[in-house]
């Protein structure tokens, strides 16, 4: 019976990971202005907020049957979906108010919003005229926000049977929603890469940029690097960076019988080999963890570190630049947060420099990894 339940759960998890549509991305060349000032960042931010708010408002007109069909699911958790929508509306309102602070410098997409009712009203009638300066962006943006919203609604619909970053289980968990405006944190999963590899390039690149990130390592991958190159090389690899843990293998920790041992073994290895870089953070692969795991993490002094901006760089359907463009669009929408890349993906060699160049003059801040 236990084996049957295990395989049943794994089939459900695999179905959740494989979303029915390709990940959403938005060609940023359709936006006619470069983000060369904080005010121009705000213009683009206001536009993305209104476009997403419009998509969110439209989704609320769907009844349960229509929503199931749209998400490609037979059963959905309406309560979690409703909670997600409420949180999204609250964040959209806060973000729009922040983005409007520069309206005296550029009034594009500045509308009267003094609360939730007026935001919903503006979202309902939001459209781009055919002769607008921004018309080339209008349809690609509409498609992006609908697809991105569906990604999020689908995760909420499956929660908590299939856990993900869409919802927190308790105080031992965090994501990027509480960060300050215009502040972002870089995180990288599933490393270190094989030697030599993307992790080596990435940590060197970050040091040259005087930046730091949190790397969530797999115990087996770290052990391979340790066996091949030794302790000093592993310490040099992560110099100036932070290292959290992601378990011994990149697999779901929600239905794995040895999930606790996976975390304990990896934590012990990292503390022993690179103690000066260790931070007490666990990043669950796929965002999947047990609903009752809070006590374990508290006892171990670990925080579950989730994210709210996903690069989707493991998707074969997205190029490196498309992954970076997705991240930038979500940075404009959410205005702060934890960005999740994978340092085992070669795409990051192109995606990260593109992202940093595109935002270099936009007044953003990058959180020091030790603050995460």
PLM segments and residue spans:
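Short, intrinsically disordered/low-complexity patches at protein termini
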Residues: 267-269, 329-330, 364, 372
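Alpha-helical, coiled-coil/dimerization segments enriched in small aliphatic residues
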Residues: 189-190
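Active-site-adjacent pocket scaffolds in enzyme catalytic domains
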Residues: 20-47, 291, 296-334
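Short, composition-biased local secondary-structure segments
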Residues: 160-177, 197, 253-271, 325-327
